[in-house]
């Protein structure tokens, strides 16, 4: 935190240092703005204050770092804080199928603390979404192995299959499930 807290303090307390920094970094670009914390937002504001060249990219629907201090309010209140900013809302999803985009819209629209927007796609419906509620990590691993077996039976090569998981500890049950099913894998 000191890597941000100390520069913020210096810029707030020393106008000469702030002016030098603002002239050195005339353009401030921030990606994943929805995941910035209070200090990061203050630093951006201090640096951009003179030249008003602040460019941020973010999606309030994808804010995931609240647990480590990110303030989604930074993106939700951006237009209030910077009333002369131009906002470009990107609603077209070029990667996902219609089924996935529609499901995502249905889930996220229930969040009342967000800016209104609705994603669209030109892609076809695609495969139906499958939700499986496993009773345990082992049950989940068995189900995943079964689905991979079905894919392989229908011609999918093992190297064309990927399993994504959020944390490393989840890999143990998956590895055991794949080993038990005789499915080759690389971690």
Language model regions located:
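Helicase P-loop NTPase motor core
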Residues: 83-86, 91-184
């Amino acid at each position: 935190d000191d890597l941000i807290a100390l520069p913020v303090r210096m810029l707030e307390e020393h106008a000469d240092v702030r002016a030098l920094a603002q002239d050195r970094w005339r353009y401030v670009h921030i990606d994943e703005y929805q995941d910035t914390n209070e200090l990061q937002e203050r630093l951006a504001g201090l640096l951009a204050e003179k030249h008003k060249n602040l460019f941020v990219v973010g999606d309030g629907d994808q804010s995931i770092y609240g647990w480590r201090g990110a303030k989604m309010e930074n993106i939700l209140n951006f237009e209030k804080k910077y009333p002369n900013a131009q906002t470009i809302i990107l609603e077209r999803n070029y990667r996902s199928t219609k089924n996935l985009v529609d499901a995502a819209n249905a889930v996220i629209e229930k969040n009342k603390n967000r800016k209104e927007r609705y994603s669209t796609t030109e892609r076809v419906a695609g495969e139906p979404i499958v939700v499986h509620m496993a009773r345990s990590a082992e049950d989940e691993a068995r189900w995943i192995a079964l689905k991979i077996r079905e894919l392989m039976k229908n011609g999918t090569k093992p190297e064309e299959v990927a399993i994504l998981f959020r944390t490393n500890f989840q890999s143990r049950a998956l590895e055991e499930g794949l080993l038990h099913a005789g499915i080759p894998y690389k971690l």
